Amino acid sequence: MQAMDGEVLLPALYEEEEEEEEEEEEVEEEQVEKGGSLGSLSMGKHRGLSLTETELEELRAQVLQLVAELEETRELAGQHEDDSLELQGLLEDERLASAQQAEVFTKQIQQLQGELQHLREEISLLEHEKESELKEMEQELHLAQAEIQNLRQAAADSATEHESDIASLQDDLCRLQNDLDDMERIRGDYEMEIASLRAEMELKTSEPSNLSISDFSGIQDELHHLRERYNLLNEEYQALRESNSSLTGQLAELESDRTRRATERWLESHLLRSTMSSESQTSELDFPEPDPVMQLLRQQLLGAEEQMQDMQDKCKNLYCELEELQHHRRTSEEEQKRLQRELKCAQNEVLRFQTSHSTQQHEELKSRLCTLQQKYDASQDEHSELLKVQMQLETELQQLRLLRCTPVESQSEKELMCRLQKLQAQHQCSVNEKEQLLEVQHHLHDKLRCHESEVHRLRSMVDCLREKNEKNSGIHLQLQEMKGLYQFSRDELERQKHMYDQLEQDFLLCQQELTELKSSQSLCEENGNCSNKCDALLARLTELQDKFKASQEEIGHLQMEQCELLEDQRRLQEEQGQLQEELHRLTFPQPKCGILQKSQELLSKLQDLCEMQLLYQNMQEQQRKLTQNQECVLKEQLEAHKHLRGFKESHFQEVLANPQDARGPKSSSCENKFKVLMDQLQALQVLYDTSQKQQEVLQREHGRLMEERKRLQAELQLCMEEMQVLQTQSPMIKRSFEYCGKNSGSRAPSTENFHRSYESSIDENEGYQKSYVSSQPSTETFLKSYDSSTSANEAFEKSYCSSSTSVSYKKSYGSVSSGETLHRSYASSSTDEDPAEPEDLEHFEETVAKVLTKLQAVKALYQVSQEEHCQLQQRMHRLLAKQKELTEELQCCEKELRECMESLGKPLPPQSDKCEIKELQTKLRELQLQYQASMDEQGRLLAVQEQLEGQLQCCQEELRQLKENRPSISSEARGKNVNKNMNKNANGVRNKKLSMACSEDLENGFENEKNLEVMLYYKASQRRLDELMKEEKEIEEARKKEREKKAKKDLCKLATNPAADPRAEPEPTEDEEENFEEYREGEDESCEAAEEGNPLKLSESKKPSPAPDPPIFSLPLVGLVVISALLWCWWAETSS
């Protein structure tokens, strides 16, 4: 309001000053006239003093006039003084107003300075906030990367664990299949044995008169073999059960580990989701627009969850397979139990057959065997075809083994076997190495994909950070411009203050001059000086008024500039908000004239893609040819197998028809056939090797084709994206072209505001171009990588099987990194381009249509090639399975053929050996009967030994009671008398028992031995008795072990040497006598030692004992109990 008052006062002051200037001009004119009159008077004075009275009166009148004029001038001076005082008041008023205005201006300046300081603080706070937000975003990115790495590691660990589990399960499957094969083989053996038993039963029923002891011995041998096999089968069954239990335990542990890991991963994913949801909520509150990094992280988390779901599905499938395997194992166990039951029934029937001699029992056994065979045949219909071949081979092998001919192998056959084994080992090693290489290759491909995705993500982050840095640099430049403007306004204010100081100084000088004018009123000469001074003062006042006006105009300009600065600041704030919005949604720029070139480049690259697809189809045709070659090889293998089977069947039929000729030396025809078969086997082995190499080459090429297919997919996706961009740009291009056509003539700038708006629009277009340039690296890198991939395809076309494709692939992969530099140059050139021309826009739609048609054609070709590739892969898998089966059959056939050819070359034993074999079988039968009787006697003697041990324990308890009841040393004599009486009683008893036969009941002998041992117990001291008991127990255990070993050795000798003379049977009695003599000597020594150590003696008779006492608490072995009892009876008789 004060400024407005000042502005209102200025025109009134200007009008007053103009009126004063007019008055001053009139006064000056009057003074000039008065000066002329005074000059004329002075000239008259100088002319002469001789003047008349009239002249004096005239002079007086003139003087009066002059006095009157002086009074007038004085009045005028008074008026001027009043005017000057008024002017001084006005000046003081103006000075006060200017001081007030200066105070107002200073306050405004201070306010502006405070606002600027506040803005600086706000800008610094915003910068700090942005930096903190950037740091937080970087930390969040690092955390997200760490979490992604952890998830990847967990997924890799789970994949490795699943792979290891799958490998272990596959091993278990193989082992179970082997066990099943073994069970089938054993079942075949059982069938063969049952068939042989049936044949023997039929022979025996048909020829009952021919039954002899040799047949029974043979049946017993077979029983022995069956028992051994039964034991072996039981052991195998236990081992299988233990392995199954261990497998179930491992499966339970795996299931627990998987459930635990699944829960841990679920908890981690749940925590990640919660954290991500909270972060997303906070970010939405702070910044309502979505963050691309967070979206990428969410997509990665969703992908990880999908992978976890896939892994869980795989686990479920594995569990189903395990359940099927367990069911298969249970069925195999049930079959094994059923076979064991049938075997036991057959054994029982055989035993019954051995003990039976009537025809009715034979017929019953035959009927039972027939029923069992029918049941067994009904249960084994599923495996009938394979088992027939195995049964024939097993019967022939058993017939050949019965001939007991030593195998004779030639050197050529041994060398061939060694070669076969080496080739099989090499084949297995190559297969294992190939599998390892494939696993390593897949692992490296996965790593490469992960690194590429991370590189793309990091590049996008770098581009975003660059855009943010560029915008921050623009904001900093604007802030520096604001600072410059503020400094300039500050300098202007200082200059105005300086001008105000100068005006005050001039005003003070004017006051001093006015005071001097007031003092100067005495003389006329001083009047002229006063008028001069007044003129100077007036001129000075006018100058001051001009300077004041100029200063006021400058202040108005400064106010206008300050208003413009505030408007610019608001506009900058609005532009900053628009830039922040553009950060989140990058819009595409106006089209340039390089779009047509880009579309043409796309067309050329799509043509290259079509060429690559045709190359891929040619490679698929070559792969088809290779599969056809493999099918031919497999057909040849099948023909060879058929030939082998026919040869085996014909040869076996010849052997069965005339066995004498088969047992003789090899014929020339057999040798020729064998050589032909071996040549065919070698040729098949060579074919197997070549097919294996071709398969390796095919697998390598398959991996390369898969890589190229992935690249093609990426390129097609990028092409589709670019076409979508071009389609979205096409309406914008048309609009821009129409707008340019309308405004082509009105481009000349009219005002500065138009220039500013035009410059701001140019800046916005540049920002759009920057954002568009930031969105172009992916397309540029795609173009570069595509060029490099075409070079790789040309190299691959030149060398189909060489490794140059891998080198070119590496180059193409390395050239992707150089895509950025090309993109930068392209971006720098694209910013300087001109708008699109109408000719380019006319051809644009045609190029877009061509590109779309090419894309559709490439897509169709790709789908067709993918379907063909799937079909080829299925055929390859089938052929590989057939090839494995055929290799296994070929190995089995080779082994069987070699065994047959070796068995055909063995000579037959003479017919004289048959009689010897029968004699040996009869002798063996007799020995087995004797052994059975001895075993029965041994059991009976063991029962007697147990009774004796019970009686000895009773005696020991009675002795302890007697020891406790002994009162003193005087009772020792009584003990001696009692001993003597007991000795006499014992001798009497022994004399009586000598009169009886030694071969009668053994209980009396054991009672005598008991009495003797009781008697000797009273003679020995307790400590010595304990020591002797321990020694005797150890000796008895050692001797028992030795006897058992000798008995086993004797049985083995009898079984191995059946042709020994039966007269050598009484030899064991001599051995027993020798053992008995050694035993007696040991007993003598122990008895003498006991008599020397004891204060008591056996008896006080004069005759010395011819035989010493036996060891105390001696428990003789089963075979020597009776002999020791008889010996003690003889010693008692001699001593009496």
UniProtKB/Swiss-Prot annotation:
Where is there biased composition of kind Acidic residues? Answer: 14-31, 1067-1091
InterPro entries named among the record's database cross-references: Cent_Immune-Sig_Mod
Major place of residence? membrane
Tell me which UniProt keywords the record has, alphabetically: Coiled coil, Cytoplasmic vesicle, Differentiation, Fertilization, Membrane, Phosphoprotein, Spermatogenesis, Transmembrane, Transmembrane helix
Q: Where is it found, in Gene Ontology cellular component terms?
A: acrosomal membrane; mitochondrion
Q: Name one GO biological process term.
A: single fertilization
- Record region (Disordered): 1-46, 741-773, 814-837, 965-990, 1040-1111
- Which stretches does UniProt call biased (Basic and acidic residues)? 1040-1052
Ranges annotated as spanning the membrane: 1112-1132
Q: What does this protein do?
A: May play a role in acrosome formation in spermatogenesis and in fertilization.
Q: What is this protein called?
A: Coiled-coil domain-containing protein 136
